[in-house]
Amino acid sequence: MEAPLRPAADILRRNPQHDYELVQRVGSGTYGDVYKARNVHTGELAAVKIIKLEPGDDFSLIQQEIFMVKECKHCNIVAYFGSYLSREKLWICMEYCGGGSLQDIYHVTGPLSEMQIAYVCRETLQGLAYLHTKGKMHRDIKGANILLTDHGDVKLADFGVAAKITATIAKRKSFIGTPYWMAPEVAAVEKNGGYNQLCDIWAVGITAIELGELQPPMFDLHPMRALFLMSKSNFQPPKLKDKTKWSSTFHNFVKIALTKNPKKRPTAERLLTHTFVGQPGLSRALAVELLDKVSNPDNHAPYSEGDEDDLEPHAIIRHTIRSTNRNSRAERTASEINFDKLQFEPPLRKETEARDEMGLSSEPNFILHWNPFVDGANTGRSTSKRAIPPPLPPKPRVNTYPEDSLPDEEKSSTIKRCPDLEARAPQVLRRQSSPSCVPVAETSSSIGNGDGISKLISENTEGSAQAPQLPRKKDKRDFPKPTINGLPPTPKVLMGACFSKVFDGCPLKINCATSWIHPDTKDQYIIFGTEDGIYTLNLNELHEATMEQLFPRKCTWLYVINNTLMSLSEGKTFQLYSHNLIALFEQAKKPGLAAHIQTHRFPDRILPRKFALTTKIPDTKGCHKCCIVRNPYTGHKYLCGALQSGIVLLQWYEPMQKFMLIKHFDFPLPSPLNVFEMLVIPEQEYPMVCVAISKGSDSSQVVQFETINLNSASSWFTEIGAGSQQLDSIHVTQLERDTVLVCLDKFVKIVNLQGKLKSSKKLASELSFDFRIESVVCLQDSVLAFWKHGMQGKSFKSDEVTQEISDETRVFRLLGSDRVVVLESRPTENPAAHSNLYILAGHENSY
């Protein structure tokens, strides 16, 4: 048992509220909240950071640093007032800087002028020179940690005590800091040894670029990728991008500050003699002018880079489309009447699915668990509060960045050349579990939780080992269950869902659809990507069904992850966009001007970045296809985009809640690109990208995956089409670690990663249909295949037809099957007529 925290004499034990009154919260971070406070005795303002401490935190280091920071008294360093420890919370009271951080400021004002940057750099170097003479280093110089007072004074914050506390508490957090301001010797510290205070000088150079370009170099890269590049011996220091915008003196200052060799990098005192920071006219007036630009933006010209792609030609009136609500039986089509007679299983959840359930990703006390393919068992999903965190999955034996260490034969290998992967894959015990002991890697994917496809279609159908006894299932009344506001679920039976009409007479040309549940209201929405923009439909308001425009640009692809909507939308060209769904819906509810003039209608550079609810993903211009996958071995989530002349790979970074660039590959892709799907391979960090399907090389191999190896530094792709017959594939998706569904013409095949059928005595691994399949949805133990005038379901167990709809008077099209199956139908005689929209509703797992 940990000893209780014992404050030193420098940390007051009494109630801090006897001395400070909290006025308002002004910020929050990973380790605590920052408040504007007032000293009740003197009336002086202060900034108070409140941090909750836990047993195990190294409090001796915190005590030592608090003692040291008391000695730092300089006009360019935030003054320390005192600390309190009360009820296991540490209060750190510092000087209040009313102007805010430079990062907050430039989010509103745009780039600082060269003179303003010079003034900030000079003041920063003065503060660092003082710290360095005291034998201290800051270690976290960046725009967010440089503050302005109301009078334009520059103050360094978050050093010493804050740095130590961050390092101490970080031990209990799975958080990777931002390395973009980090010196190369710090990035390579494990390889090359220690570093000294000259790392702060490098950070000043990076911050100078940040203030002029609104972000540090490599900011669009995933942090781990940036660290990797900085630690390489051939890393080149960054420069200012615009050679003509800035003076040669500024360019030279950045070059000297960013001297790669720390032994040749100047000290703070030496750099203060540089012409850039020694020029006349550097006074507080420059900072006061900057603060005035924040407070009175109307008195200053708005910042804009004139990106014509951002200008919206659409009217500013919010676009709403109402359903015609033709509900009488006489107006219903034959297929709609038959819809009521058929019931369907829930869609199968893939083990490689990236999105989180029900928008509950921010609720760590709940896990979601359902068991597919269990005869006689409840097929629905139960939500249970977990008492003990599940164990982490075993760490795969992969290199963080394997390009330099892969043997030559591995660099050029693809799936079709792989040895038997089943022998290398870790053996995972598959059984039904009590919700409180589901491993993380399995919890996030329902297939891995029970008798999934890999067990049904297994090469070893005769079980050789008896499954361990299941723990007693707790009564469902023991667990709270979130309420979802949408179409009501039917009782949890194996065949309990049907297609329900949700919209009549839709005039839009819809390209894709997905679903999302608002984490606060629990309302379920269908989100449509159309030729006229992104629209939403609230399933909790179907009595007055309306589709509301969320974003005004043509959209061809959608995916929701952690309340973030990723879209492939068109400006001048197609590009990946990221949309903050919660903020966009909140904005739509605001009365008055905000509800009609939305932030996405402003050019990106006019709207302050801090308030941008929709942002472009850098380096994705010209993207025309996308796919997302989750690696079930590591939990990492990847997004891959097909560009006109290559591929871009991004990885989801949880602390920043966004996809960040990992790699860019330049090479020609097949045209047309009929297949574009990622396949996760054991012991490979990054997925393979399947861009074509060809005929197998022998009788046992029914298909061959033509792939691009994103793990290789040189030989990325196979000779696509060389000596093999290309197949016209319709659909490829990885259901489980070694289970892939391939749809070809009239056939659906379940194969392993070598393209061989998953043989089984009890289940069919190949299903045939009497029509050319246009799209498929994999249900719990069957496949639902769609064609022009209907759909047909076939069972893996019996190879028999389970459901069938055929209506020659209607043309059907599957719009999306990501968690909710969305279907469209139009009259055959008039394909341009308004459409009806349906969803497969009734299962709890649909919500």
Swiss-Prot record:
Residues 20-277 form the Protein kinase domain. The active site is at D140 (proton acceptor). It catalyses: L-seryl-[protein] + ATP = O-phospho-L-seryl-[protein] + ADP + H(+); L-threonyl-[protein] + ATP = O-phospho-L-threonyl-[protein] + ADP + H(+). It is an enzyme of class 2 (transferase). Keywords: ATP-binding, Cytoplasm, Kinase, Nucleotide-binding, Phosphoprotein, Serine/threonine-protein kinase, Transferase. The modification Phosphoserine is found at S335, S433. Residues 507-820 form the CNH domain. Residues 378-487 are annotated as: Disordered. Its EC number is 2.7.11.1. Its cofactor is Mg(2+). Pfam families: CNH, Pkinase. InterPro entries: CNH_dom (IPR001180), Kinase-like_dom_sf (IPR011009), MAPKKKK (IPR021160), Prot_kinase_dom (IPR000719), Protein_kinase_ATP_BS (IPR017441), STE20/SPS1-PAK (IPR050629). ATP binds at V26, G27, S28, G29, T30, Y31, G32, D33, V34, K49. Residues 408-423 have a biased composition (Basic and acidic residues). It is found in: Cytoplasm. One of its GO terms (molecular function) is protein serine kinase activity. One of its GO terms (cellular component) is cytoplasm. Its main location: cytoplasm. One of its GO terms (biological process) is intracellular signal transduction. SUPFAM superfamilies: Protein kinase-like (PK-like). Residues 430-448, 457-467 have a biased composition (Polar residues). Belongs to the protein kinase superfamily. STE Ser/Thr protein kinase family. STE20 subfamily. May play a role in the response to environmental stress. Appears to act upstream of the JUN N-terminal pathway. Interacts with both SH3 domains of the adapter proteins CRK and CRKL. This is Mitogen-activated protein kinase kinase kinase kinase 5. The lineage of its organism: Eukaryota, Metazoa, Chordata, Craniata, Vertebrata.
